[in-house]
Amino acid sequence: MREIVHLQTGQCGNQIGAKFWEVVSDEHGIATDGQYKGTSDLQLERISVYYNEVAGNKYVPRAVLIDLEPGTMDSVRSGPFGSLFRPDNFVFGQSGAGNNWAKGHYTEGAELVDSVLDVVRKEAEGCDCLQGFQITHSLGGGTGAGMGTLLISKIREEFPDRMMATFSVVPSPKVSDTVVEPYNATLSVHQLVENSDETFCIDNEALYDICFRTLKLQTPTYGDLNHLVSIVMSGITTCLRFPGQLNSDLRKLAVNMVPFPRLHFFMVGFAPLTARGSQQYRAVTVPELTSQMFDAKNMMAASDPRHGRYLTVAAYFRGKVSMKEVEENMLSVQSKNSNYFVEWIPNNVQTAHCDIAPRGLKMSVTFIGNSTAIQDLFKRIADQFTAMFRRKAFLHWYTGEGMDEMEFTEAESNMQDLVAEYQQYQEAHVDEDEVDEEVYEDEAPPEE
């Protein structure tokens, strides 16, 4: 079966990753001891996408957990599903990266990276037909950003024809953990543009807004934010984990979603949104799902899709939904908002469907959009980057680890190019005259 190897790096990556495994294990009926306690054969049919089956009918996540300090790993290990993971797959250092990208990418992380690759290789060799890798990390810190991108480029070298999907938590505009976030994020994006096939952008502020506005939580915790992320991750990977009518895999997703290789940064969303542990009291309808899914308040990255145009969209419906109704609703959204979709990619909205709904819901939908509005997010980081870099503030932390200023300049211009590319395609229109002229030339009578 088409297996995926999951990697989680750094504090953020490990916390999101741990939550993801809780959700997926629950959906597949895997108990905390790795035994199958489910009720439906469908849960086991494609379980090998994420789990290895070991002696005694025990299912073990195909996950590699990486950090440069032992703290977060210890809390994952003592968490509800901690005993599920393979003990050998915990790879950690002792020194920490101290939110310094250079430490994660060049010094501390580089020392640990070979032992991580050994574990990754071992997991990949055990696969029947490896589909690709997914990595959860943040872009604002040291380990997830610096070492995460180092791992991505190393895995890329070794498995050049396998998909690389990243779930990247981007620094948010108002909620900042560290002052050097813009540096770390810019250096990371510089790497992701080249080495990732699809990057799902998530940001804490957007998640915070969803918790506050939509879910009416007065004091959202990181647990609540991570819960939202894990729902989306579960939704994106549904088609891979369950049999459905339209099965997508990471590669099909990329083929449908990435019109130009560098523009692979997606916004994600989910509907219907519910708080952790709450029950759904009313049935949702397909029209409600489609309208909530395209709603700007629903996006998990702080960019407003109304500021740009969609190049491509994918929607994964789950549960007992009528595909006919889905198609009709998706078409009506497109025709009513046609100026928000580029007209030079016809049929740029893809729908897939899986019969099995998530726990506690009758039906749900996961939204993935490749919108030119994502440039807002990069612009914001670039502005903050430039403000500090002009004064060379905090640079000594990076140059002290052997980095060169040149690398900062390169990363900055690569990110500005990315913004310019998004802008260029946002403004691109099909010129009526051009089309007519071409037709005319073809049909011109042969000259005597």
From Swiss-Prot:
CDD domains: beta_tubulin
Keyword Cytoplasm: yes
Domain of life, source organism: Eukaryota
Binding site for Mg(2+): E69
Binding site for GTP: Q11, E69, S138, G142, T143, G144, N204, N226
GO MF entry, a single one: structural constituent of cytoskeleton
CC per GO annotation: cytoplasm; microtubule
Locations listed in the record: Cytoplasm, Cytoskeleton
Name under which the protein is recorded: Tubulin beta chain
Provenance organism: Melampsora lini
Upper taxonomic lineage: Eukaryota, Fungi, Dikarya, Basidiomycota, Pucciniomycotina
